[in-house]
């Protein structure tokens, strides 16, 4: 990630932009770009893993419709959607702790997924461990 956003935050009736987190008054929470670069370099070192940096949107529901996916992509400029990363980013931002969200993408979030969830989680865990091992091994 280079940013995270909470796509389900909406205090727009009060005049705020959609996604604004009250109290810290921010929509796009910045991740650690240098760490993201190092993680992508480690993924390239492992091979067979595509690393894409961009904004990740988080919310309180699974996104499984093309309509919702389009709304999140167009409203926030997100390249991926999930349920945890922005909450972690929010806590890190408030406490001045660097972070970077890494996601393994299982489907297109449009209702077309046919991947077996248990097979995907095993592959995602294996790839994540390989990338983190390479990151630590490279000393970058």
Predicted segments, located by residue:
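Glycine-rich phosphate- or other oxyanion-binding loops that anchor nucleotides, phosphorylated ligands
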Residues: 1-140
